[in-house]
């Protein structure tokens, strides 16, 4: 397993896993995904992105996904875990996610929003990837999107 994140996040990861079973199987790769010049390591069978694309603008999401797509070996998959407000089982959950978007936009970085699924799927397609499968209802309202070239 290789984890890519900001150096300070990787330092916390290393502290948290030190001495735990399997810690020797976790590698780290520091980088700022918001910098279009940041390379992304390749050669993996699976790339997992969990609950962070919703923090960025469409342009930033497409840039990240394009760079991931460029590193994929044949047959590799990209899995994206997000809370998609229009794919919730209950209307109240959709409403709550929409209000979370308002909170994050106003209080965080001005970009954060919970995705409308077709908007995210459009960004995925724009990056050169395609949606292969969608699994809804994971955990508390999460969707897992399997992507490939």
Could you tell me what each predicted segment is?
Residues 1-149:
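Alpha-helical subdomain
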């Amino acid at each position: 397993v290789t984890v890519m994140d900001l150096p300070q996040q990787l330092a916390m990861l290393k502290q948290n896993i030190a001495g735990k079973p399997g810690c020797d199987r976790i590698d780290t790769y520091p980088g700022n995904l918001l910098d279009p010049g940041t390379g992304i390591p390749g050669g993996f069978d699976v790339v997992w992105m969990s609950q962070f694309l919703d923090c960025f603008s469409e342009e930033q999401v497409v840039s990240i996904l394009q760079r991931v797509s460029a590193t994929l070996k044949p047959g590799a998959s990209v899995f994206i875990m997000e809370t998609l407000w229009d794919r919730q089982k209950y209307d109240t959950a959709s409403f709550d996610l929409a209000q979370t978007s308002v909170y994050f936009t106003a209080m965080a970085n001005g970009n954060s929003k919970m995705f409308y699924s077709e908007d995210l799927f459009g960004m995925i397609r724009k990056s050169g990837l395609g949606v292969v499968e969608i699994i809804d209802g994971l955990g508390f309202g999460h969707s897992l999107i399997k992507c490939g070239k």
